[in-house]
């Protein structure tokens, strides 16, 4: 066996001691409700931090007494038989050393995965800083992610780097630095900036140089960088840009068209697009509009191609949609799906007054039509008709009638305003004149007021029907059904 093989075997033996060392451990670390068993002699020999820690424990803590001699072990006094009997009694009949209480040290400054990585390196001299591929990693919700450049993998590496510096394990810190240098080349801009600040804190010049050049090439403006980085760091990045041959090419570009001058790999463009969309959706779910802005300006994310507004309307709250639209990088009237629905169509189908109002406030077109010619008003009119004739919408029992009425009024008002602004007369009997504007009055437009009256009667009728149904429920069932809903709508669609 060569010396290299011997060292590998020794490293593996020590690693197995850590993995299966509960029976022989004399110290345990309590982290995140889990115990990690270890051995003070190994940790003290490998790390000055642990040596000082174990030497500076509570003075009331006394080291465990030496174990009694094993069975039949020759002693200076000779009496082998007597010691043997005492050995059995002291060991409880097991013939071994009496168990000593294990020292438990609570740990709150680092997480479980980081502590395990540090201990693995201390025991074996080797550690894989990269997260397990395709396995679960806290902080990463993407299915099938290989954790080579995701934010969770970067955070794990940064936490391991900080722990290595705290424990005085410089070799592990260098190993993590090399890992980060390869990760940042494919990581997002916000992750690169996190690594940049960590390299500055720990004075890692090579990692600093790599990250600073990547941020300089990102195309983010100095004003935006100043919101996330110290002023002196922004100044150094601007100096790098001034010396870079890409500065002249990047200067006249729009902030929303960055990275277009960088080489693209067609083979990975589809995977990159899907990864960007997943990260954008996670940012929207977390209401992190700044991260979305960084992705737009630093990575060239197309919000319309990613259907950002549609996703936000369906899965986020009003404030997120409002902030997203105020970025100015998304078209509120962009279409999605095989029928070409706009975000306003989705808001109408959801019967969400909050979404309808915020979209209309940001100039959503109430007259936009799908490929089938359906407008948002048509969607609401159809839902209203279902309520008028059936009293409820099949599959949409969660819809509140008051919200439906409010959505209807909002869209109707927007249609009227749009029609008036486009030049269609709306006063007196001239509403149907032959010289109408771009949106001539039709039978649908003429029925807006009638539809409002009918919808108002609908809600009043539903309240009356509910009261009658409650009264009938208290009576005995005599076979007479409740009156049909149409009796409450004398001016309905009959």
Curated annotation (Swiss-Prot):
GO terms for cellular component: cytoplasm; nucleus. It comes from the Eukaryota. InterPro entries: Ankyrin_rpt, Ankyrin_rpt-contain_sf, BTB/POZ_dom, NPR5/6, NPR_central_dom, SKP1/BTB/POZ_sf. Zn(2+) binds at residues 140, 145, 147, 150. Residues 60-95, 421-443, 471-494 are annotated as: Disordered. The BTB/POZ domain mediates the interaction with some component of ubiquitin ligase complexes. PANTHER family: BTB/POZ DOMAIN AND ANKYRIN REPEAT-CONTAINING PROTEIN NH5.2, BTB_POZ DOMAIN AND ANKYRIN REPEAT-CONTAINING PROTEIN NH5.1. May act as a substrate-specific adapter of an E3 ubiquitin-protein ligase complex (CUL3-RBX1-BTB) which mediates the ubiquitination and subsequent proteasomal degradation of target proteins. Transcriptional co-regulator involved in the promotion of leaf and floral meristem fate and determinacy. Required for the abscission of senescent organs, probably by regulating the cell wall disorganization in abscission zones (AZs, e.g. pulvini at the base of leaves). Homodimer. Interacts with TGAL5, TGAL7, TGAL8 and TGAL9. Belongs to the plant 'ANKYRIN-BTB/POZ' family. 'NOOT-BOP-COCH-like' (NBCL) subfamily. This is BTB/POZ domain and ankyrin repeat-containing protein NH5.2.
């Amino acid at each position: 066996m060569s010396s290299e093989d011997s060292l590998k075997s020794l490293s593996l033996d020590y690693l197995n001691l850590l993995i299966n060392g509960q029976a022989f451990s004399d110290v345990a670390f309590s982290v995140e409700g889990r115990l990690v068993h270890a051995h003070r002699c190994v940790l003290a020999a490998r790390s000055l931090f642990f040596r000082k820690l174990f030497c500076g424990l509570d003075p009331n803590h006394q080291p465990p007494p030496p174990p009694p001699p094993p069975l039949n072990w020759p002693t200076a006094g000779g009496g082998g038989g007597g010691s043997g009997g005492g050995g059995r009694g002291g060991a409880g009949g097991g013939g071994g050393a009496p168990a000593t209480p294990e020292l438990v040290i609570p740990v709150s400054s680092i997480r479980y995965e980081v502590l395990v990585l540090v201990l693995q390196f201390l025991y074996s001299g080797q550690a894989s800083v990269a997260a397990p591929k395709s396995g679960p990693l806290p902080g990463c919700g993407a299915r099938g992610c290989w954790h080579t450049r995701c934010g969770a993998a970067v955070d794990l590496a940064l936490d391991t780097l900080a722990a290595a510096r705290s424990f005085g394990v410089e070799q592990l810190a260098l190993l993590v630095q090399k890992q980060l240098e390869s990760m940042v080349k494919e990581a997002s801009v916000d992750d690169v900036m996190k690594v940049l600040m960590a390299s500055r804190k720990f004075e890692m010049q090579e990692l600093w140089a790599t990250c600073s050049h990547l941020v300089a090439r990102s195309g983010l403006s100095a004003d935006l960088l100043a919101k996330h980085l110290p002023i002196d760091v922004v100044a150094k990045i601007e100096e790098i840009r001034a010396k870079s041959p890409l500065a002249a090419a990047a200067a006249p570009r729009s902030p929303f068209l960055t990275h277009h001058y960088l080489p693209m790999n067609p083979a990975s463009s589809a995977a990159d697009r899907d990864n960007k969309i997943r990260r954008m959706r996670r940012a929207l779910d977390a209401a992190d509009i700044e991260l979305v802005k960084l992705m737009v300006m630093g990575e060239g994310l197309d919000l319309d191609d990613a259907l950002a507004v549609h996703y936000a309307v369906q899965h986020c709250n009003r404030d997120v949609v409002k902030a997203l639209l105020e970025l100015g990088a998304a078209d509120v009237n962009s279409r999605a799906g095989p029928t070409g629905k706009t975000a306003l169509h989705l808001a109408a189908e959801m019967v969400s007054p909050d979404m309808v109002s915020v979209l209309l406030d940001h100039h959503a077109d109430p007259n936009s039509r799908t490929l089938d010619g359906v407008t948002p008003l048509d969607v609401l009119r159809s839902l209203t008709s279902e309520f008028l004739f059936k009293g409820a919408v099949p599959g949409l029992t969660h819809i509140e009638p008051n919200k439906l009425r409010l959505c209807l009024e909002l869209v109707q008002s927007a249609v009227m305003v749009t029609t008036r602004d486009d030049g269609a007369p709306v006063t007196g009997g001239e509403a149907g004149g032959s010289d109408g504007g771009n949106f001539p009055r039709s039978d649908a437009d003429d029925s807006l007021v009638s539809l409002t009256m009918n919808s108002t009667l609908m809600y009043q009728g539903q309240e009356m029907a509910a009261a009658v149904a409650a009264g009938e429920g208290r009576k005995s069932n005599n076979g007479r059904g409740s009156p049909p809903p149409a009796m409450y709508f004398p001016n309905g669609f009959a």
